[in-house]
């Protein structure tokens, strides 16, 4: 049989938990009075000097005038971009983004809140939040945006050298990448001793041109020039035969993927209330 002290102790605990649950419920309903919706962002990378896209999707809503899209950046006061009542509202936009942002207005009703960012800069890197408010509810998700430079490599045969060689060039990379060569015939071979790689700073003093030369190549073989940093990986392939030269290039952005977020404050409140009921039965 429980002592008087134990009864008082559990009574106090029950009251605290019930009050906590009630507060959470009040906050949850007070903030929105609606359900929370799913918002999904996609981690992506921006190429310096070019236009980029910060991807964000949400549950579609045909009531365009009731949709509010806000983009925020960690460490920046003001908004990156705001769209509401069917049009842009840039009255609170931070100056570093002026004239550089736009949403895909004709795709908002189908759930596209992606942000177009013009003339990507190194300083655009960081954590962004895509915040959505519709007639169905509200939600948000974070996005990690990396900035750098990356480009396709081009491989050519250098017939002017004393022995046949391959020259791999890529015009713009940042941060400085690693470069490696591979051969279809000599798989696993280390070509570092028969290749030479250099980096030349471009005129804007940020990005660099990558040049790598592979010596003593043989015909009827396929060689690959691989350039990679923490943002992207590019591969250029070349096949040299007696009669022709075949080339192929591809570029892959690294560490890209979805980041869904579903808020559920109300559920937490009900969980606390359920716990308090269990304790009251003790």
Swiss-Prot record:
Post-translational modification: N-glycosylated.
Domain Ig-like V-type as annotated: residue spans: 35-144, 153-241
PROSITE patterns the UniProt entry points to: IG_LIKE
Signal peptide segment: 1-24
Sites carrying sugar chains: 216
Cellular component terms per the entry's GO annotation: external side of plasma membrane
Lipidation (GPI-anchor amidated glycine): 257
A Gene Ontology BP annotation from the UniProt entry: regulation of cytokine production
Location within or outside the cell: Cell membrane
Family assignment from sequence similarity: Belongs to the immunoglobulin superfamily. BTN/MOG family.
Protein name: V-set domain-containing T-cell activation inhibitor 1
Organism: Rattus norvegicus
The organism's taxonomic lineage, starting at the top: Eukaryota, Metazoa, Chordata, Craniata, Vertebrata
């Amino acid at each position: 049989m429980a002592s008087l002290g134990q009864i008082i102790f559990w009574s106090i605990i029950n009251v605290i938990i019930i009050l906590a649950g009630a507060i959470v419920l009040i906050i949850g309903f007070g903030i929105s009075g609606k359900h929370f919706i799913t918002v999904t962002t996609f981690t992506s990378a921006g190429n310096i000097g070019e236009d980029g896209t910060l991807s964000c999707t949400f549950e579609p809503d045909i009531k365009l005038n009731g949709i509010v899209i806000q983009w925020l950046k960690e460490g920046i006061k003001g908004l990156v971009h705001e769209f509401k009542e069917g049009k842009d509202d840039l009255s609170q936009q931070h100056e570093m983004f002026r004239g550089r942002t736009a949403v895909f207005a004709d795709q908002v009703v189908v759930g596209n809140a992606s942000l177009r960012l013009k003339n990507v800069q190194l300083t655009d890197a960081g954590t962004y939040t895509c915040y959505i408010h519709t007639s169905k509810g509200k939600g948000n998700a974070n996005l990690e945006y990396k900035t750098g430079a990356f480009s396709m490599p081009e491989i050519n045969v250098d017939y002017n050298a004393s022995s046949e060689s391959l020259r791999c060039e890529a015009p713009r990379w940042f941060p400085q990448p690693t470069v490696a060569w591979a051969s279809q015939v000599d798989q696993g071979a280390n070509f570092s001793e028969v290749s030479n790689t250099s980096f030349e700073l471009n005129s804007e003093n940020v990005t660099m041109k990558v040049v790598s030369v592979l010596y003593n190549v043989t015909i009827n073989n396929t060689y690959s020039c691989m350039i990679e940093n923490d943002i992207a990986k590019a591969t250029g392939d070349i096949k040299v035969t007696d009669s022709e030269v075949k080339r192929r290039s591809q570029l892959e952005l690294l560490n890209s993927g979805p980041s869904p977020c579903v808020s559920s404050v109300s559920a937490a409140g009900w969980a606390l209330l359920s716990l308090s009921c269990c304790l009251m039965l003790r």
